[in-house]
Amino acid sequence: MYAIIKTGGKQVKVEAGQEIYVEKLNADVDSTVEFGEVLILGGDDVKVGAPLVEGAKVVATVIKHARAKKITVFKMKAKKNYRRKQGHRQPYTKVRIEKIEA
């Protein structure tokens, strides 16, 4: 059984036992989080929400909080000596999907 959930402005396909990276959640490590915005439930029969599947949720456990690798944003204007360099590290949360409830 799989589900497509909405978290952090993105849609993610998940299955039980899978470990995924999502945008940073306000939850402690080893705590349980519930994703209530389930768009599609798949398996033997597929349930498509309009826009959400009623009564469905995905339960997950927070494994760790971390930050992604640094990216460099560089702006410049040719021949004008205009240069701007900025770095960014996006925070994320790693979670393990425990169960999908329909």
Curated annotation (Swiss-Prot):
Signal peptide: none annotated. Keywords: Ribonucleoprotein, Ribosomal protein, RNA-binding, rRNA-binding. InterPro entries: bL21-like, bL21-like_sf, Ribosomal_bL21, Ribosomal_bL21_CS. Transmembrane segments: none annotated. The keyword Glycoprotein does not apply. GO terms for biological process: translation. One of its GO terms (cellular component) is ribonucleoprotein complex. GO terms for molecular function: rRNA binding; structural constituent of ribosome. Pfam families: Ribosomal_L21p. This protein binds to 23S rRNA in the presence of protein L20. This is Large ribosomal subunit protein bL21. It comes from Exiguobacterium sibiricum (strain DSM 17290 / CCUG 55495 / CIP 109462 / JCM 13490 / 255-15). The lineage of its organism: Bacteria, Bacillati, Bacillota, Bacilli, Bacillales.
